[in-house]
Each structure stands twice: as C-alpha cells, then as structure tokens.
C-alpha cells in the first residue's frame, strides 16, 4: 500500500520533469531547434494542425530552419501562422519552401531566455512539491484510519521526502544545463 504511494509519487514527479524538458525544447539556445516551432498551428482546411503535420521541418544550420509543405497551396497559410506566432523571425517564401533565418542572439536575449528557463524550473518544482503534499496527505489518512502506525507514517513521509529531493535535484540539473546551453556564445 505504501509502495503504491511511492510508485505513484515517483511517476508523477517524473512526468513533471518530462514536461519541463518538453518546455525547454521550445526555448532557443545557441543552435536553433525545430522544436521552437512545435506550438505553431496552421489552418489546414479549417482545422488547426501542427506545423510538422503539414510539412517537413528541418534545420539547415545553426540559425536557419526550412519548412517544406507537402501541399504547395499551404505556403501562404504557413507563412501567416509563423508571423502570427511572433517568434522573432520573418518567413522567407521562395515558392517551394519557407526558410526562417534566426539572427544571432544578443547577450540580453540570452539572459531573458535563461530567466524563462529558470521560471520553468521553478514551476516544475512547485508541481513536484504539490505531488509530495498529496502523497503525504495519503499517508496521513492511512495513519488516521489506523491502517499504518505512527512510526510507519513517519518513515513513509521520510521516503517521500527522499523521492522529492531526487526529483528537485534532477530539475536543478536540467535548469543549469539549459541555462549553460543558452548563455554559451
């Protein structure tokens, strides 16, 4: 019964870490990633569709992305969606593909993006702490219902704290690695 609480807690905390890493993939670092376009939706015959579902997106070099739509009539719609997304670039439509030329980041931009990464890390830590609180509440309820002793409850809460500390450590490492990647010139 306690093991089930531990396993559920670990799973939920792991999901918070995975969500953080997904969020990090949308942040720009020294090299532009195709993931920066993940949140962009294109109007595909009246349905908002992910950009990578209507064409191939590839990185040509550290500052250039190319989008090759599977249907050429989508070029204008893709171009409009990118402009509306306000990601800091103007799409260059050559009639076959759309190229996005990202300017090199200034030191100030790098600091702002690093600050965003830190904020994302804090949000993930809050999610982990909320998971810890939920797990501790379950343990306290078991103790209150006399299903476990007070000693077992204390040990369980200590175990939950260890799981939480591990998750927080992983989040801190992820944030530090992302900040280093962003601030690296």
UniProtKB/Swiss-Prot annotation:
CDD domains per record: RRF (cd00520)
Top-level taxonomic group: Bacteria
Cellular localisation: Cytoplasm
UniProt keyword list: Cytoplasm, Protein biosynthesis
Region described as Disordered: 128-158
A single GO molecular function term of this UniProt record: ribosomal large subunit binding
UniProt entry tagged with the keyword Acetylation: no
Gene3D superfamilies, A to Z: 3.30.1360.40, Ribosome-recycling factor
GO cellular component: cytosol
GO biological process: cytoplasmic translational termination
Function: Responsible for the release of ribosomes from messenger RNA at the termination of protein biosynthesis. May increase the efficiency of translation by recycling ribosomes from one round of translation to another.
PANTHER family: MITOCHONDRIAL RIBOSOME RECYCLING FACTOR PSEUDO 1, RIBOSOME RECYCLING FACTOR
HAMAP family, per database record: RRF
Family to which the UniProt record says this protein belongs: Belongs to the RRF family.
Entry protein name: Ribosome-recycling factor
Organism of derivation: Helicobacter pylori (strain J99 / ATCC 700824) (Campylobacter pylori J99)
